[in-house]
Amino acid sequence: MIKLVLIRHGQSLWNLENRFTGWTDVDLSENGLSEAREAGAILKKNGYTFDVAYTSVLKRAIRTLWIVLHEMNLAWVPVHKSWKLNERHYGALQGLNKDETAQKYGEEQVHIWRRSIDVRPPALTEDDPRYEMNDPRYKALKKGEFPLTECLVDTEKRVLDYWHSEIAPKLKNGNKVIISSHGNTIRSLVKYLDNLSSDGVVSLNIPTSIPLVYELDENLRPIRHYYLSMDGEVPEGEIPKHISF
């Protein structure tokens, strides 16, 4: 049996401020740092270890992974970073307050942008100061590859490309893998692994910094999945609450 651990980054500063974040490189809040330490302690207490780790090129996911591995005394584990594990690009919504955006465009429209799988938010323009194409972390991307906005289907396409080319072969070779990433990135992976319908993924929420474990067969088909807490597996349908840490 193969085990895969997925973890969404801890609370970010813009999660705290209720802003659309996307590819904006926002750090963890103090609470997010605590959540990451708690996640590492949970994994260590439950006897987990890892051979290789994957994350995005955004600091909130990277820092969460660093803290988790530090808490587990696994700082030596090789870490692979890729833009393909970045959060969904929210286009011109990035940086905007979600409540204020709902007041401007209407709650129904914002809900469609956030939760539908195939509707993109308004795109950034290339002269927008939020356009990140010239950031050195993206220098390998061709202009046509760099998103100005994304729907969940767009995000899923790049995430699964990286899954099949990089992560799945490691799992099949017996490596113990952890992925520290973002809400929509993990939603994309869960949709694929569990073969969820479009309706099923719309209502799927991923909590910050709580380990989600998938037990997989030799073909990487899910046997079962569950969240972890200090007390072990959490009953199906329940999500553990963070404790003060």
Curated annotation (Swiss-Prot):
PROSITE patterns: PG_MUTASE (PS00175). The keyword Isomerase applies. The keyword Disulfide bond does not apply. Substrate binds at residues 8-15, 21-22, 60, 87-90, 98, 114-115, 183-184. Its EC number is 5.4.2.11. The active site is at H9 (tele-phosphohistidine intermediate), E87 (proton donor/acceptor). Pfam families: His_Phos_1. SMART domains: PGAM (SM00855). It catalyses: (2R)-2-phosphoglycerate = (2R)-3-phosphoglycerate. Keywords: Gluconeogenesis, Glycolysis, Isomerase. InterPro entries: His_Pase_superF_clade-1 (IPR013078), His_PPase_superfam (IPR029033), PG/BPGM_mutase_AS (IPR001345), Phosphogly_mut1 (IPR005952). Catalyzes the interconversion of 2-phosphoglycerate and 3-phosphoglycerate. Belongs to the phosphoglycerate mutase family. BPG-dependent PGAM subfamily. This is 2,3-bisphosphoglycerate-dependent phosphoglycerate mutase. It comes from Bacillus cereus (strain ZK / E33L).
